[in-house]
Curated annotation (Swiss-Prot):
Residues 8-21 have a biased composition (Basic and acidic residues). It is a single-pass membrane protein. It is found in: Host cell membrane. This is Uncharacterized protein S9. Residues 22-36 have a biased composition (Low complexity). It comes from Diadromus pulchellus idnoreovirus 1 (DpIRV-1). The gene is S9. The chain crosses the membrane at residues 317-333. Residues 1-40 are annotated as: Disordered. Keywords: Host cell membrane, Host membrane, Membrane, Transmembrane, Transmembrane helix. One of its GO terms (cellular component) is membrane. Disulfide bonds: none annotated.
Length: 352
């Protein structure tokens, strides 16, 4: 039976693979039929089952945070986070109380990977390094046990690819690290603030239009302005915006985007650029309309000059804002790379 992995599930799917046939001194295969199958990792008893964690991942993570694991030599598994490397993170969790388990679990998870990466708990049956003898690994633990290891993948796609290559592992459970790091949240809050400013500016410009007086538009605007993160709306919130054939629906769409909680930085950046370009096009359209209206008036020349000034300002802002955000994005990207190097230097090994 081959090992399988089930990503993004609330209930872990556990399956194990039969060990390959052993060979004796006469190069004859030994019968493994009577050999006990690997058991689920130690520490999964009622004694340490704080608040009855729902998944195997939660149970194992509690045990790792509590220090309930055995020493494993780092050289055995060269592309994973071994339990030995996690020992220094577990000392403060030994007096863990049940009511503190969920919070400390999240704090413990932060030590393992960056946001968006996949943490996988596996049981190593055979060494990933072919230069290590199989018997040397079995000597570390009983024959009916496996070595628990945390492995980190850069993305869910990378996890799916790598797990199909590692035929020697028992895949126990996987979980995506939540995006809860301070730097990421800070940058995301800054981008959301910029979007809110654009949203408010457009709202003020459209006070006399039917868009600004739309009840759904006002409800979303006021709700987001009065709360820190904003409520969560489904796609039905965009229905009123679809009834407007022109660019006046942009503020309502921006309001919908602002109320979503699970936005990536790239999505926010794209929305800022798109919103600014759309608002600029709308402003240019309005200026052109104003120019046509005042062609027959005495002040046609001054009206045209003012329109040209407004057009220049809009174009300048359209260029400046994306450039500034691009610089900020790459600064943040370099910062995350630096953080990863620091984590690697503290014996937390990220898989290649």
């Amino acid at each position: 039976m081959t090992s399988t992995m089930k990503l993004f599930t609330d209930h872990a799917e556990i399956s194990v693979r039969e060990r390959p046939p052993q060979r004796n001194n006469n190069n004859q295969e030994q019968d493994n039929s009577n050999r006990p199958a690997p058991r689920r990792l130690f520490g999964l008893n009622e004694k340490y089952n704080f608040d009855q964690p729902e998944t195997t991942f939660d149970k194992l993570l509690h045990q790792i945070c509590l220090g309930n694991y055995e020493q494993v030599d780092d050289k055995i598994i060269n592309d994973s986070i071994t339990l030995a490397a996690l020992r220094k993170y577990s000392c403060e969790y030994k007096d863990l109380k049940p009511e503190k388990a969920p919070k400390l679990k999240n704090e413990c998870m932060k030590q393992f990977a960056q946001p968006g990466q996949v943490v996988e708990i596996i049981g190593i049956d055979l060494p990933l390094d072919s230069s290590i003898d199989q018997d040397d690994l079995y000597d570390l633990k009983d024959d009916n046990d496996v070595i628990p290891v945390l492995r980190v993948y850069q993305s869910a796609q990378d996890a799916r690819t790598k797990t199909t290559e590692n035929k020697k592992d028992y895949i126990l459970d996987t979980r995506v690290i939540p995006d809860n790091f301070a730097a990421s949240l800070f940058l995301k809050s800054v981008l959301r603030a910029i979007l809110l400013q654009i949203f408010s500016s457009l709202q003020n410009q459209l006070v006399k239009t039917d868009v600004a007086t739309n009840p759904e538009f006002m409800r979303m605007s006021n709700a987001f302005a009065s709360t820190r993160r904003g409520p969560f709306y489904n796609i039905a919130s965009l229905v009123p915006a679809l009834s407007y054939p022109d660019s006046r629906s942009v503020p309502l769409i921006v309001g919908f985007i602002l109320t979503q909680e699970n936005l990536s930085l790239l999505s926010l950046y794209s929305m800022i650029v798109t919103t600014k370009v759309s608002s600029t096009i709308m402003a240019l359209y309005e200026n052109n309309s104003s120019e046509e209206e005042c062609e027959d008036s005495i002040s046609a020349a001054s009206c045209t000059n003012q329109s040209n000034v407004n057009n220049s300002d809009n174009i300048r802002m359209t260029i400046t804002l994306p450039c500034g955000l691009t610089i900020a994005f790459f600064v943040y990207y370099r910062y995350t790379l630096f953080q990863r190097r620091v984590k690697c230097s503290t014996s937390i090994l990220l898989s290649s």
